[in-house]
């Protein structure tokens, strides 16, 4: 069956998908992961797959470094330097310099630390500014943390339409908190243009890279960004609950060094000399002040395994080649779904234009939860995100209020045949109304 549109260079059959996967210069990277043969895994935007070497590395850390080295391994195995060493590996993926990224804590805590630091800087420079700006539909933890920071600092959190975020800048806005790629729609903001507009308006910007780091090129330095955070368990494949990372522009850390400024969670490993056990806090220099608690060594070892796969990708074209494959997979899947599932209740929510789309495709469906559960039962794993309650009188916006099916494309291991098979199963689930089976109606704690 021919499904690609006239003039399309995308595959027209499953056999063509198989051939395209065989010719893929990145195909060897899939061998770096454990992906069950009976599963089409399109949820790397929520939890990355397990790298092949992670289990052995964790066993090595547990048995040799912990079991034999015991507490000596803080020095002999370099545990104490993990936040900086692994941070440098992330820096290479996000346009940051060596020594500018620390791996620490969770994304939520790092949002709190960076947003608080940005607010503190602005309260010194422009104390009349009282607004923290973000977009409607931003990931909830970012908004919850922003509410807390606003309440603690006497500020106000203001939400604006993400499509027109730069139009919301006024002389009241102190800081913009924005996720680079929206978790629901997959819409990608222009980081350089948005940061430039913020600076022109006198605001600082905190970027959340949870849905972009490891999936597409990010250039924090080139964009002249102020602060950034991100998680380790999505496209970086660090495992469930992997540590997060934090970055601050060197101009801000230099100023914080000069003025002995602290971020609000001044834990002992963010101290300039933690093993002096001094009774008063003295912040470490640079990004190290943003470390709070003791590094979770096993979790960091797992994250490092995920990051090391990107080193294997470098001779194959690196992040640019991964992005090109991601775009092709997304374009192909959208075309397949819209061709096969026309009239079956799906509505594309992600941008059709790949230039403003991250590495996922989201579709709204009134029975989205049931549809996704039926797909998972057939071995196609994506995920579901419930729509927000629509304010009375507000126009419908499926990117905000639609129940969404999300499909993530991780070019390190996702194949074109996976996109084909997923679209085929999605059509069958919808056309047969298999999703109406009562077993698919029960909501789980994790969606």
Question: Model segments located where?
Answer:
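Pyridoxal 5′-phosphate
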Residues: 1-447
């Amino acid at each position: 069956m021919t499904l690609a549109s006239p003039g399309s260079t995308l595959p027209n059959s499953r056999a063509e998908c198989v051939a395209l996967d065989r010719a893929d210069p990145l195909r060897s990277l899939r061998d770096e992961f454990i992906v069950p043969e009976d599963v089409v895994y399109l949820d790397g935007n929520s939890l990355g797959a397990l790298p092949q070497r992670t289990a052995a590395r964790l066993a090595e850390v547990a048995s040799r470094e912990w079991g034999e080295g015991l507490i000596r391994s803080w020095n002999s195995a370099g545990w104490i330097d993990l936040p900086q060493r692994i941070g440098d590996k992330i820096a290479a993926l996000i346009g940051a310099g060596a020594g500018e990224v620390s791996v620490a804590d969770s994304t939520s805590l790092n949002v709190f630390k960076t947003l608080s630091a940005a607010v503190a800087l602005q309260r010194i420079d422009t104390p009349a500014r009282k607004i923290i700006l973000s977009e409607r539909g931003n990931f909830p933890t970012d908004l919850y943390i922003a509410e807390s920071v606003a309440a603690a600092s006497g500020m106000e959190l203001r939400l604006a339409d993400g499509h027109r975020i730069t139009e919301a800048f006024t002389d009241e806005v102190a800081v913009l908190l924005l996720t680079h790629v929206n978790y629901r729609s997959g819409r990608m903001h222009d980081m350089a243009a948005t940061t430039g507009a913020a600076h022109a308006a006198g605001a600082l910007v905190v970027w959340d890279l949870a849905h972009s780091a490891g999936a597409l090129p990010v250039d924090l330095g080139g964009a002249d960004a102020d602060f950034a955070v991100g998680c380790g368990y999505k496209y970086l494949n660090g495992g469930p609950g992997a540590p997060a990372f934090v970055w601050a522009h060197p101009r801000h850390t230099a100023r914080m060094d000069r003025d002995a400024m602290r971020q609000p969670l001044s834990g002992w490993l963010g101290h300039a000399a933690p093993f002096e056990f001094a009774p008063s806090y003295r912040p470490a220099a640079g990004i190290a002040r943003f470390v709070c608690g003791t590094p979770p060594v096993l979790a960091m070892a797992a994250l490092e395994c995920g990051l090391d796969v990107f080193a294997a990708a470098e001779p194959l074209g690196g992040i640019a080649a991964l992005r090109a494959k991601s775009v092709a997979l997304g374009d192909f899947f959208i075309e397949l779904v819209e061709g096969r599932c026309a009239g079956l209740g799906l509505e594309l929510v992600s941008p059709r234009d790949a230039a403003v789309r991250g590495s996922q495709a989201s579709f709204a469906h009134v029975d989205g939860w049931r549809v996704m559960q039926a797909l998972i039962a057939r071995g196609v794993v994506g995920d579901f995100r419930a729509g927000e309650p629509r304010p009375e009188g507000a126009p419908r916006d499926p990117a905000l209020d639609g129940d969404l099916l999300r499909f993530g494309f991780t070019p390190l291991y996702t194949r074109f045949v996976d996109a084909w098979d997923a679209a085929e199963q999605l059509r069958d689930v919808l056309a047969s109304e298999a999703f109406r089976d009562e077993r698919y109606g029960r909501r789980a704690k994790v969606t």
